[in-house]
């Protein structure tokens, strides 16, 4: 059984993002109150706030953890047009004795001229790299050449998406058969027919990111996007949060069938589409094996989705924040108590905000 445990977050405004660290024992939250809070899970399973500080001069849209191989490192992004990198300092201070940790700003990334709407660390096999996207339609990729010096970041790539960007997701695959890839979503609500999801792939020859050829047909505003962890699959799975939940597969077309040196072509199939939230969906998040997807919407529920042996996706659980039973929980499958073990592994946020992201 899932047990709902309420946490008095003590944020003074809307919470926009919740992010778990790699091990699922630390959590970061960010809010329109311009602060980030870090929470640690005790042996008894309770969450305690061990750090809280003002991070930006505007609403903080997203917060994300680096892989622990690089230390205890966070990145945040804000309406104030910046992204920031933070590192936890472990010392002999009295703070630690009082159960408090100390976080130091290592760098501020100031290249964007508009609201920075998402920030994500690259998969660890790529080194310490960070991607941001902003309301002006530009994805920027930074690298820390010396992982021991987080105050130095160099801008490696700027990718123009032609549409206001709302969210990004790195493809986590570490297979040499797959080039680094990043998916970008747009919440542009103008009625133009441009696809709201774009895929960019790194080209070893040009050393640049190029738009992959995809027939991605999403035209509704996209609030969140997430590649599934890839455990040996030859294709990729991408989840999208828009007015509903959508799951796509991306299968690379064989190299000999594509033009030499040209952009990779992908065969795109929509394998699931669910409007069970009956509202805007704000976050999608995979478990660590890429087999269970969690989505959260304006209906106040987190819904869990899983494919059966026939590759048919079904709802396998519905969670409501206050722990009350959910009407219509029999929709699209039944609750499955065995999924309880997936919760610590649900990487990144499950709590979206219906406030949207204001563009400067």
UniProtKB/Swiss-Prot annotation:
Organism of provenance: Homo sapiens
UniProt keywords, alphabetically: Cell cycle, Cell division, Centromere, Chromosome, Chromosome partition, Isopeptide bond, Kinetochore, Lysosome, Membrane, Mitosis, mRNA transport, Nuclear pore complex, Nucleus, Phosphoprotein, Protein transport, Repeat, Translocation, Transport, Ubl conjugation, WD repeat
Classification via SMART domains: WD40 (SM00320)
Phosphoserine: modified positions: 179, 190
Assembly: Component of the Nup107-160 subcomplex of the nuclear pore complex (NPC). The Nup107-160 subcomplex includes NUP160, NUP133, NUP107, NUP98, NUP85, NUP43, NUP37, SEH1 and SEC13. The SEH1 subunit appears to be only weakly associated with the Nup107-160 subcomplex. Component of the GATOR2 subcomplex, composed of MIOS, SEC13, SEH1L, WDR24 and WDR59. The GATOR2 complex interacts with CASTOR1 and CASTOR2; the interaction is negatively regulated by arginine. The GATOR2 complex interacts with SESN1, SESN2 and SESN3; the interaction is negatively regulated by amino acids.
Signal sequence residues: none
One record GO biological process: mRNA transport
Cross-link position per record: Glycyl lysine isopeptide (Lys-Gly) (interchain with G-Cter in SUMO2): 12
Description of how activity is regulated: The GATOR2 complex is negatively regulated by the upstream amino acid sensors CASTOR1 and SESN2, which sequester the GATOR2 complex in absence of amino acids. In the presence of abundant amino acids, GATOR2 is released from CASTOR1 and SESN2 and activated.
Known function: Component of the Nup107-160 subcomplex of the nuclear pore complex (NPC). The Nup107-160 subcomplex is required for the assembly of a functional NPC. The Nup107-160 subcomplex is also required for normal kinetochore microtubule attachment, mitotic progression and chromosome segregation. This subunit plays a role in recruitment of the Nup107-160 subcomplex to the kinetochore. As a component of the GATOR2 complex, functions as an activator of the amino acid-sensing branch of the mTORC1 signaling pathway. The GATOR2 complex indirectly activates mTORC1 through the inhibition of the GATOR1 subcomplex. GATOR2 probably acts as an E3 ubiquitin-protein ligase toward GATOR1. In the presence of abundant amino acids, the GATOR2 complex mediates ubiquitination of the NPRL2 core component of the GATOR1 complex, leading to GATOR1 inactivation. In the absence of amino acids, GATOR2 is inhibited, activating the GATOR1 complex.
Family label: Belongs to the WD repeat SEC13 family.
Protein name listed in UniProt: Nucleoporin SEH1
InterPro entries in UniProt: G-protein_beta_WD-40_rep (IPR020472), Sec13/Seh1_fam (IPR037363), WD40/YVTN_repeat-like_dom_sf (IPR015943), WD40_repeat_dom_sf (IPR036322), WD40_rpt (IPR001680)
The UniProt record lists the keyword Lipid biosynthesis: no
Cellular compartment(s): Chromosome, Centromere, Kinetochore; Nucleus, Nuclear pore complex; Lysosome membrane
Skewed-composition ranges (Polar residues): 324-354
GO CC term, one of those recorded: GATOR2 complex
Domain of life of the source: Eukaryota
Region feature (Disordered): 324-360
WD repeats: 10-49, 55-96, 111-152, 160-210, 217-258, 276-315
GO molecular function list: structural molecule activity
Pfam family, one: WD40
């Amino acid at each position: 059984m899932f047990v709902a445990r309420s946490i008095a977050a003590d944020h003074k405004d809307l919470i926009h993002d919740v992010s778990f660290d790699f091990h699922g024992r630390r959590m970061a939250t960010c809010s329109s109150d311009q602060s980030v809070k870090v929470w640690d899970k005790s042996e008894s399973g309770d969450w305690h706030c061990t750090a809280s500080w003002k991070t930006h001069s505007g609403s903080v849209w997203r917060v994300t953890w680096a892989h622990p191989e690089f230390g205890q490192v966070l990145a945040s992004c804000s309406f104030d047009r910046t992204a920031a990198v933070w590192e936890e300092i472990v010392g002999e201070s009295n703070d630690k004795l009082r159960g408090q940790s100390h976080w130091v700003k290592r760098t501020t990334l100031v290249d964007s001229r508009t609201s920075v709407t998402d920030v994500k660390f690259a998969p660890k096999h790529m080194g310490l790299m960070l991607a941001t996207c902003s309301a002006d339609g530009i994805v920027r990729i930074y690298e820390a050449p010396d992982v021991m010096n987080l105050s130095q970041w160099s801008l490696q790539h700027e990718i123009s998406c032609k549409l206001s960007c709302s969210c990004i997701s790195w493809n986590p695959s570490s297979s040499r058969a797959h080039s680094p890839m990043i998916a970008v979503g747009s919440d542009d609500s103008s009625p133009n027919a441009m696809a709201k999801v774009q895929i960019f792939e790194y080209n070893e020859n040009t050393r640049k990111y190029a738009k992959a050829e995809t027939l991605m047909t999403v035209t509704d505003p996209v609030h969140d996007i997430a590649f599934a962890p890839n455990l040996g699959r030859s294709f990729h799975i991408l989840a999208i949060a828009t007015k509903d939940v959508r799951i796509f597969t991306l299968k690379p077309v064989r190299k000999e069938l594509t033009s030499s040196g040209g952009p990779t072509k992908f065969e795109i199939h929509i394998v699931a589409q669910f409007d069970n939230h009956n509202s805007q969906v704000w976050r999608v998040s995979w478990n660590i094996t890429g087999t269970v997807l969690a989505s959260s919407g304006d209906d106040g529920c987190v819904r869990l989705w899983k494919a059966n042996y026939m590759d048919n996706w079904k709802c396998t659980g519905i969670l409501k924040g206050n722990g009350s039973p959910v009407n219509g929980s029999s929709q699209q499958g039944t609750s499955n108590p065995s999924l309880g073990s997936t919760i610590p592994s649900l990487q990144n946020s499950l709590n979206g905000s219906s406030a949207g992201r204001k563009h400067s």
